[in-house]
């Protein structure tokens, strides 16, 4: 049977996937940067599965959209649609370590218990003011603008704090019309603002010295190693697609540095 997607740049088509407008906006914003396909093995470009009961199975589709550019080692979107069980967009921009840039991260998740939504420009080296100062000075006004309109998502685990900025926008919303309205009126414009700021920082970024690049690379490796070990989607993906596929996906695609 012919694969549904042949390239990491092929469109993600999943009917009723609620996060499609977010991915579409991000892809359009990247067009001026002339994205090229990022190497993703065929078994991770699109995978079908089932969840639910034998009498009432629910179709699961997991897709990966990915690219690279002059300054981005990897841009990737992990996209999951499983009907009432889950709808997910995990969108991360990994810059080359030769540029003094944070990661861009958006985690948009709908589960039967509600929406879990997070946006951030995540530092590679939290304790390094040279790395964080210019980012946080511009990020915090955007964060303050949108956080007052959202309920707080809850505390961040102590071990995770080094991997987030003070502008980590994190909320939990109830399912239903009120949550949908907040997604449309707050989360979507906040997503655009965070991404616009990030792309402005990218445009200004210049290559750093080899010594600085090595330090940034070490920070990126720590971040991606932590994310790979603590990925909260691991249990869900394993339930949908099996343990072996999930571990390979996490370590060879999502956090592959």
From Swiss-Prot:
EC category: oxidoreductase
InterPro entries: Ferredoxin-dep_bilin_Rdtase (IPR009249), Phycoerythrobilin_Fdx_Rdtase (IPR022827)
Keywords in alphabetical order: Oxidoreductase
Descriptive protein name: Phycoerythrobilin:ferredoxin oxidoreductase
Coiled-coil segments: none
EC number: 1.3.7.3
Catalysis: reaction(s): (3Z)-phycoerythrobilin + oxidized 2[4Fe-4S]-[ferredoxin] = 15,16-dihydrobiliverdin + reduced 2[4Fe-4S]-[ferredoxin] + 2 H(+)
Record bears the keyword rRNA-binding: no
Family: Belongs to the HY2 family.
HAMAP family referenced in this protein's UniProt entry, alphabetically: PebB
Annotated TM spans: none
Domain of life: Bacteria
Cited Gene3D superfamilies: 3.40.1500.20
Gene Ontology BP terms: phytochromobilin biosynthetic process
Free-text function comment from the UniProt entry: Catalyzes the two-electron reduction of the C2 and C3(1) diene system of 15,16-dihydrobiliverdin.
Cited PANTHER family: PHYTOCHROMOBILIN:FERREDOXIN OXIDOREDUCTASE, CHLOROPLASTIC (PTHR34557:SF1)
NCBIfam families according to UniProt: PRK13249.1
The keyword Repeat is annotated on this UniProt entry: no
GO molecular function: cobalt ion binding; phycoerythrobilin:ferredoxin oxidoreductase activity
């Amino acid at each position: 049977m012919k694969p549904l997607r042949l390239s990491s740049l092929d469109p993600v088509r999943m009917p009723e996937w609620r996060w499609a407008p977010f991915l579409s906006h991000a892809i359009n914003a990247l067009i001026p940067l002339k994205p090229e396909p990022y190497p993703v093995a065929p078994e991770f470009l699109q995978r079908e599965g089932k969840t639910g009961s034998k009498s009432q199975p629910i179709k699961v589709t997991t897709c990966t959209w990915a690219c690279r550019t002059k300054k981005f080692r990897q841009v990737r979107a992990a996209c999951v649609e499983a009907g009432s069980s889950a709808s997910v967009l995990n969108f991360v921009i990994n810059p080359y370590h030769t540029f003094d840039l944070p990661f861009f991260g958006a985690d948009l998740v709908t589960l039967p218990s509600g929406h879990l939504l997070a946006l951030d420009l995540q530092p590679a080296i939290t304790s390094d003011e040279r790395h964080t100062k210019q980012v946080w000075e511009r990020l915090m006004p955007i964060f303050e603008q949108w956080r007052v309109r959202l309920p707080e998502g809850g505390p961040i685990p102590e071990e995770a704090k080094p991997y987030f900025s003070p502008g980590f926008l994190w909320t939990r919303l109830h399912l239903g019309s009120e949550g949908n309205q907040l997604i449309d009126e707050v989360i979507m414009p906040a997503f655009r603002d965070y991404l616009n700021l990030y792309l402005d920082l990218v445009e200004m970024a210049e290559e750093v010295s080899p010594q600085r690049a090595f330090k940034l690379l070490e920070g990126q490796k720590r971040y991606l190693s932590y994310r790979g070990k603590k990925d909260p989607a691991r249990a869900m993906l394993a339930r949908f697609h099996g343990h072996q596929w999930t571990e390979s996906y996490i370590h060879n695609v999502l956090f592959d540095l």
